[in-house]
């Protein structure tokens, strides 16, 4: 009960009408990348017109965006969308690291991104995501800095160097244990909704 449902509007090479085709179903949240970035085999193309169209659809259907930040410019693009009335505060931002050709998993980069987010949007919540071997590092750093964690097989299939992760549950369990280490509380579904300013 209370599970948060989030859709993805990702999808290289597709029009906004396709990438946002499910938003009329009014999930709680949907991803919104606020810029383009090089991926290993091509460009994750998010033209300003596409971003604006997806943001407007999310406003229309009362879907909270998860702002995906693959490089620093995307944070300032999100700030411009707020000024234009196309994004509503409080924001929720996801900082993504470890995608080849995008931001490397360097702690000082996350530190700066978080400091800029706090300056621009003091009420925002944020998550850090590490792709591949950087996942565990980003889990640690996010907890240390007061953020939230993303984990799971979509981003990383290994538990450690010696073996594959058995399941998403195993990776989630590891983060739950890390929360104890950093004296952080694992949110219930109800608490997560409150943190993200989502309807009950």
Describe each model-derived feature in a short phrase.
Residues 12-17, 98-103, 159, 195:
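Flexible glycine/acidic-rich beta-alpha junction loops that bind and position SAM and/or redox cofactors
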Residues 1-7, 54-60, 112-123, 169-183:
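Alpha-helix-loop-beta-strand connector modules within alpha/beta enzyme cores
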Residues 177-200:
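Mid-to-C-terminal alpha-helical segments outside catalytic/metal-binding sites
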Residues 29-154, 165:
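Catalytic alpha/beta core domains of metabolic enzymes, predominantly
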Residues 1-45:
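Active-site beta->alpha loop and helix N-cap motifs at the rims of alpha/beta catalytic domains
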Residues 5-8, 67-68, 192:
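Short beta-strand segments at enzyme active-site cores
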Residues 148-180:
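A hydrophobic, small-residue-rich beta->alpha segment in the mid-to-C-terminal subdomain
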């Amino acid at each position: 009960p209370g599970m948060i449902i989030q859709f993805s509007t990702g999808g290289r090479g597709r029009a906004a009408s396709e990438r946002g085709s499910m938003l009329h179903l009014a999930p709680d949240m949907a991803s919104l990348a606020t810029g383009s970035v090089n991926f290993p085999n091509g460009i994750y193309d998010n033209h300003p017109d596409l971003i604006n169209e997806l943001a407007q659809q999310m406003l229309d259907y009362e879907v909270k965006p998860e702002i995906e930040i693959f490089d620093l410019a995307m944070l300032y693009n999100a700030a411009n969308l707020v000024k234009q009335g196309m994004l509503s505060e409080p924001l929720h931002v996801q900082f993504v690291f470890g995608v080849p050709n995008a931001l490397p998993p360097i702690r000082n980069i996350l530190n700066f991104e978080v400091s800029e987010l706090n300056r621009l949007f003091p009420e925002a919540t944020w998550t850090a995501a590490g792709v591949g071997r950087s996942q565990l590092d980003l889990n640690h750093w996010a907890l240390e800095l007061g953020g939230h964690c993303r984990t799971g097989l979509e981003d990383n299939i290994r538990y450690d160097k010696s073996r594959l992760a058995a399941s998403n549950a195993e990776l989630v369990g590891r983060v739950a244990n890390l929360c104890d280490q950093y004296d952080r509380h694992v949110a219930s579904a109800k608490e997560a909704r409150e943190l993200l300013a989502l309807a009950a």
